[in-house]
A protein has these predicted regions:
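ATP-dependent carboxylate-amine ligase
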Residues: 322-325
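His/Asp/Glu-rich metal-coordinating catalytic cores
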Residues: 2-70, 75-289, 306-320
């Protein structure tokens, strides 16, 4: 069979049966590309299990075909399996993603002592060729900056993979989906659409993230003591609004929890999270500041939950201010 006649194969290894473990193989003859490498956090019916990984045995068995890994955005359900996969691969494979996503991945890999990964930064409008598979990237709006969708072309067909998205017309960072690029690719032809379908059966539209801001401002302004606000540590748009509300009410910001500290640092260094240095204080310095002048940003759900431990009495309030907690 000639290269031109090689079939295009799409092999989902995770992500289609729930939230988490996103990993999809795109294979064309001697070439293979992996889209995302995420993990899933266990539910209450899985005691003793810390996390769940997709079964990527097929990737390891066909490692010589793997030309690259594309990561659509920086959430754990799309990046969390990368350290484990890279440790199991014999060769360094290039990882393609946006600046912020690569920043988050770099921090995660450092925890596993994976040094000098082959990062390749891409953005909306970027084009790459990986063997007989070519990929165009376009921006998507999500709860995290730097989210990308991909348009894949091969001799045997075209695939559009949206990544996770939220059609928000007033996003916090002003970056809307690249409708022009999506329209262009649609006109070129799409043989298979792989689309985010979270809450697709729920009627109506998801409200804009910008609508959260006024409520945060009001709650934080009127709270009589310390305010603890829980969020995913990668939800940079939400964190920005928390910081804005804290500053508007004259409160200092305390960041607590390992993942929250890491992600806020990376987002600030790369310019995605705008906080004045004077508005942040170290968790060890809170005792000298009145309670009504403090906002604590902590994680609140799934495998990194600081707030859940607080709510169930598993940690004291002061312990929650341990920056390594």
């Amino acid at each position: 069979m000639t290269k031109k006649n090689q079939p295009l194969r799409i092999i989902p290894l995770g992500g289609l049966d729930g939230i988490g473990k996103n990993m999809t193989v795109v294979e064309c003859g001697p070439d293979m590309v992996l889209i995302d490498a995420g993990l899933m956090f266990p539910d209450d019916s899985q005691p003793g299990i810390d996390l769940v990984l997709p079964d990527y045995t097929y990737v390891l068995e066909n490692e010589e075909k793997l030309r690259g890994i594309i990561v659509t955005h920086g959430h754990e359900d799309h990046t969390g399996a990368l350290p484990y996969l890279l440790q199991d691969l014999n060769n360094k494979v290039p990882i393609f993603s946006s600046k912020l996503t690569l920043g988050f991945i770099e921090g995660k890999l450092a925890e596993f002592r994976i040094r000098s990964p082959k990062f390749r930064e891409v953005k909306s409008g970027s084009h790459i060729s990986l063997g007989c598979i070519s990929v165009d990237f376009f921006s998507m709006t999500h709860s995290i900056p730097g989210a990308l969708g991909v348009y894949i072309k091969s001799p045997q067909g075209t695939v559009m993979h949206t990544g996770d998205f939220k059609l928000d017309q007033t996003p916090i960072d002003g970056v809307t989906p690249d409708y022009a690029a999506i329209t262009k690719f649609a006109k070129q032809g799409v043989d298979l659409l792989l689309s985010d379908s979270t809450n697709a059966t729920v009627p109506g539209f998801t409200k804009s993230e910008a609508e959260v801001g006024p409520t945060l401002n009001e709650v934080i302004k009127n709270a009589p003591g310390r305010v603890f606000v829980a969020s995913f540590s990668s939800h940079i748009h939400r964190l920005q609004q928390i910081c804005n509300a804290a500053k508007a009410s004259g409160r200092k910001i305390v960041v607590t929890g390992r993942s929250m500290l890491t992600n806020t640092r990376v987002a600030r260094e790369l310019g995605y999270l705008k906080i004045d240095e004077a508005d942040i204080i170290d968790a060890y310095d809170v005792n000298g500041i009145p309670d009504d002048k403090i906002v604590v940003m902590c994680t609140g759900s799934q495998g990194e939950a600081a707030l859940r431990a607080l709510a169930y009495g598993q940690r004291r309030a002061q312990d929650a201010l341990d920056p390594l907690g």
